[in-house]
Amino acid sequence: MLLILLSVALLALSSAQSLNEDVSQEESPSVISGKPEGRRPQGGNQPQRTPPPPGKPEGRPPQGGNQSQGPPPRPGKPEGPPPQGGNQSQGPPPRPGKPEGQPPQGGNQSQGPPPRPGKPEGPPPQGGNQSQGPPPRPGKPEGPPPQGGNQSQGPPPRPGKPEGPPPQGGNQSQGPPPHPGKPEGPPPQGGNQSQGPPPRPGKPEGPPPQGGNQSQGPPPRPGKPEGPPPQGGNKPQGPPPRPGKPEGPPPQGGNQSQGPPPRPGKPEGPPSQGGNKPQGPPPHPGKPQGPPPQEGNKPQRPPPPGRPQGPPPPGGNPQQPLPPPAGKPQGPPPPPQGGRPHRPPQGQPPQ
């Protein structure tokens, strides 16, 4: 559709310029008897069209100025868009049985491809320097809504494949939406604060998110000893242990780093903290978790499925080591270092 619109715009501009030079020397054709009435002759530098043959509907009325006229509609098909003023190009009329394409946009906008028939409507155009991902496929949950500012949106996931790292940009990174049949991804975020993942039903609830330079310890695991709580200050937090599966590297960027949430069927991971922190992607059941987004210009590869993943990437500030895997006793919790005191883990859902 984008290529068609661009080609039509170029053809309309070139034809309008060539017709404007020759119209003053040409005369409008006379009306043929037994055929519908043609358009009246026009004054000025306007292109003149021949009258339509019988059995077809009447074309659009003439326009003034340097305008390009689209072809008259065919019978049995919907009417094309009305004419426009100024040096504008006219798009082709829509085809029957297919949804209407997206309207043209102005400014520095990037529009995704229009949806195919039988599939949900694509996202609406946005203003500003935003980049919109492709529209979701049918039968899958809707991706997160667009965000304002210089934010980039991750592409929707494909079923049956591990999720790759979403794009980076700005002070905020949005995780990709979840797969079908799985819990909904995190809502959009505004400002320099990231939102914690939504609670899973039937599982212990994580403590609510916090603001400032506080670091929250992970909630207690049922039937397992409590891990050491994280320390406050400008230190990234290690991801929580997952029983029987290796942990991927945590994200980087900002003053604090949030570990990815656990997969379904496992206890809830630690909530997010305030500040310039990226949000990890939601969990995918039975599939390896891709690395969460990173800040800055650091490329990251998704981990291969079924293989243990390497140590977390180094950041500017000191990192906390990974807690021991589940099922093994853990040592005493270290005291909090610097910053504000951390909040003890809670098991009640956030109010």
UniProtKB/Swiss-Prot annotation:
Pyrrolidone carboxylic acid PTM sites in chain numbering: 17
Record keywords, A-Z: Glycoprotein, Phosphoprotein, Pyrrolidone carboxylic acid, Repeat, Secreted, Signal
Signal peptide, first to last residue: 1-16
A GO term from the CC aspect: extracellular region
Pfam families: Pro-rich
Modified positions (Phosphoserine) in chain numbering: 24
Annotated stretches, region: Disordered: 17-351
PTM description: N- and O-glycosylated; contains about 50% carbohydrate. This is composed of highly fucosylated N-linked saccharides, the major structure is a biantennary asialosaccharide containing 2 fucose residues on one antenna and an unsubstituted terminal lactosamine sequence on the other. The Gram-negative bacterium F.nucleatum binds to carbohydrates containing unsubstituted GalBeta1,4GlcNAc residues. N-glycosylation on Asn-87 is prevalent in head and neck cancer patients.
Protein name: Basic salivary proline-rich protein 3
Organism: Homo sapiens
Encoding gene, per UniProt annotation: PRB3
